[in-house]
């Protein structure tokens, strides 16, 4: 399982849910780099996963929330172009697109559910 050298224009785009499109870039079993677009108003509800998640916003603005479970939000804010973030392994987080947004995310370990797509 490895895609060492890739080009965004040559990769398959997958709509994960309405308004959210993912493109896998380079990855192996330990790490994964993905390109995402989100349509203004689309949301990812509070969730968590094993992978540490680092992101960098290329255009648009995201509203994020961090929580200590499904409901208790302890931090929220906005991230715009040039902004970056990191969510720890199993940290609950949510995202809403305040504009049409384009961003890159890095996961460690690679998200196996994304590789199958």
List each language-model region with its residue ranges.
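Short beta-strand His + acidic residue motifs that chelate non-heme Fe in jelly-roll/DSBH
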Residues: 44-46, 64-65, 87, 92-98
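Ligand-binding loop in jelly-roll beta-barrel domains
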Residues: 78, 89-113
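Short acidic-glycine-tyrosine-enriched beta hairpin
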Residues: 69-89
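Conserved short histidine dyad/triad with adjacent acidic residue
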Residues: 32-49
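Residue-level recognition of short, solvent-exposed, well-ordered loop/turn junctions
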Residues: 39, 58, 80-81
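Short, surface-exposed secondary-structure edge patches
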Residues: 35, 54, 75-77
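A short, N-terminal "cap"/entry segment at the start of jelly-roll beta-barrel domains
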Residues: 1-30, 77, 116
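Glycine- and acidic-residue-biased ligand/ion/polar-headgroup-sensing regions
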Residues: 51-69
């Amino acid at each position: 399982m490895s895609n060492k050298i890739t080009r965004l224009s040559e990769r398959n785009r997958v709509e994960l849910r309405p308004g959210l499109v993912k493109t896998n870039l380079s990855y192996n079993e330990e790490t994964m780099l993905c390109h995402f677009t989100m349509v203004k108003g689309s949301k990812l509800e509070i969730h968590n996963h094993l992978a540490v998640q680092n992101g960098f916003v290329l255009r648009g603005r995201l509203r994020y929330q961090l929580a200590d479970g499904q409901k208790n939000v302890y931090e929220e804010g906005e991230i715009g172009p040039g902004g970056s973030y990191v969510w720890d392994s199993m940290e609950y987080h949510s995202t809403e697109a305040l504009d049409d947004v384009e961003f890159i995310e890095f996961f460690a370990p690679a998200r196996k559910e994304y590789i199958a797509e």
